[in-house]
Amino acid sequence: MNGVVIPQTPIAVDFWSLRRAGSARLFFLTHMHCDHTVGLSSTWARPLYCSPITACLLHRRLQVSKHWIRALEVGESHVLPLDEIGQETMTVTLIDANHCPGSVMFLFEGYFGTILYTGDFRYTPSMLKEPALILGKQIHTLYLDNTNCNPALVLPSRQEATQQIVQLIRQFPQHNIKIGLYSLGKESLLEQLALEFRTWVVLSPQRLELVQLLGLADVFTVEEEAGRIHAVDHTEICHSAMLQWNQSHPTIAIFPTSRKVRSPHPSIYTVPYSDHSSYSELRAFVAALRPCQVVPIVHQKPCGEFFQDSLSPRLAMPLIPHSVQQYMSSSSRKTNVLWQLERRLKRPRTQGVVFESPEEKANQVKVDRDSKKHKKENLSPWAGHLERLCPHPLQARKQLFPDFCRKERDEPVLFCDSNKMATVLTAPLEFSVQLQPIDEFLFPETREKIGLESPLLSRGDSGSPARGNQSDCVGCGSPPAHISRAVPLTPESRGLALKYLLTPVHFLQAGFSSRNFDKQVEKHQRVQRSSPAVLSPVDVG
């Protein structure tokens, strides 16, 4: 990856690894070649600065959101804030890099001094006439494209290389020409060849869309048989492809590159056409700028010793106060948090799922299972009366037992067959319980539905229901009209705790088992035989 985070600044150029970016908050893209976009994808969510052409290609090819792309005009200076409040700013100027469509150099000016980042570029003397460089600009740090920084590598200019390609094509007037290219670049070479030989240049639909964006001459087409010059991807040119092409029509292939290419076929030619500066051009460029220091962009090719005599002896690197460095680092971290918050707000909210309580569900399933198991064998006379009123005991309980019990006992709800929560009332079986009649809580429609023609119990003279005193429950002479005598319980009535929850479930789980409950029933029967007691139906909420 040919990118860098400039030390002691919040600037990152062609660097897209956020984990290694540190305090960087301003990200710049020189051009769209793949070795400069490693790590950049559609998930990118930071402001990104580039040229207008690169901005268009970035959105179309990598699907980076337009919300994060900041297109800056080439040849103009732009003031950018270095913190979220705009207290510290810097100036950036974009200069045409003469490398590929949309490629630029960045000139940064701020508290850190003046930094020129060339990216990939092909030097021409006209670059020194740029307004940003012509005013005797003092460059403190020059980040230099050192791809061809090798004294042994002699490269012709692009005009000279173009003439070599023209002469080569003229040697094969009856042949088709395959030009091996990368995904971006050398479109101007294709235009010159089309105009020189008065033929159409056949492109892929993707590259045709690109040349239309660049506004080049109308000499390109996607029709295979329209012209003899075909631009293909460099990976398509191989020995098998050459055999196939030559079977249908005589064909030669040309690689316009400064890289060493091993020719797998005698009809494949390499011409040293390069979009990177040659060694002599780099020397001329550095000598004209006379920076304080030169930093190579391609880290695998150190080249500092080649430019020692071209550095400025009088220019010193600016001193950045430690307080400024701390301030810029802290502000960048705060801004990164704001970016993350903004990105999070743009995401669609995840829909939550409400789960039932596992304990509640387990208790409900257990009680339902036990209730169904003992349905026939554990019916008390009172429960049987309810079943005669309504064929479905569950429906009868829902209709007959409203949630008024909560007001009298305030006990927690442990189980309810319906969606409405209810409170279970319990009382020792030795004593009778005086409760409010159940029929008065029924609406007339409900009473008719379950087959009641008259109230089950008369209300009596008392105004509101109240729990009877325990002293009045045993040995009383004649019960009031609204209290019914308890029917003697039979052995079949065992297991009522699990069926009708006369005892809270957590009591049963805590040791008050059904066996203990059966003992209470037997004890109650003995009391009934010795002294008949009064038992009214138990209200269950």
UniProtKB/Swiss-Prot annotation:
Which family does the record claim for this protein? Belongs to the DNA repair metallo-beta-lactamase (DRMBL) family.
Which cellular component appears as one GO term in the record? nuclear body
Could you confirm whether the keyword Lyase appears in this record?
no
Pfam families attached to this UniProt entry: DRMBL
Effect of knocking it out? Answer: Embryos are smaller than wild-type embryos and neonates die during the first day after birth. Cells activate the ATM kinase at their telomeres in S phase and show leading-end telomere fusions which are accompanied by a reduction in the telomeric overhang signal.
Q: Which UniProt keywords apply?
A: Chromosome, Cytoplasm, Cytoskeleton, DNA damage, DNA repair, Exonuclease, Hydrolase, Isopeptide bond, Nuclease, Nucleus, Telomere, Ubl conjugation
Keyword DNA damage attributed = yes
A GO biological process held by the record: telomeric 3' overhang formation
What is said about the domains?
Answer: The TBM domain mediates interaction with TERF2.
Annotated function = 5'-3' exonuclease that plays a central role in telomere maintenance and protection during S-phase. Participates in the protection of telomeres against non-homologous end-joining (NHEJ)-mediated repair, thereby ensuring that telomeres do not fuse.
Q: What is this protein called?
A: 5' exonuclease Apollo
What is said about its interaction partners and assembly? Interacts with MUS81, MRE11 and FANCD2. Interacts with HSPA2, HSPA8 and HSPA14. Interacts with SPAG5. Interacts with TERF2; the interaction is direct.
Q: Which species is this UniProt entry from?
A: Mus musculus
Molecular function via GO: 5'-3' exonuclease activity; beta-lactamase activity; protein homodimerization activity; protein-containing complex binding
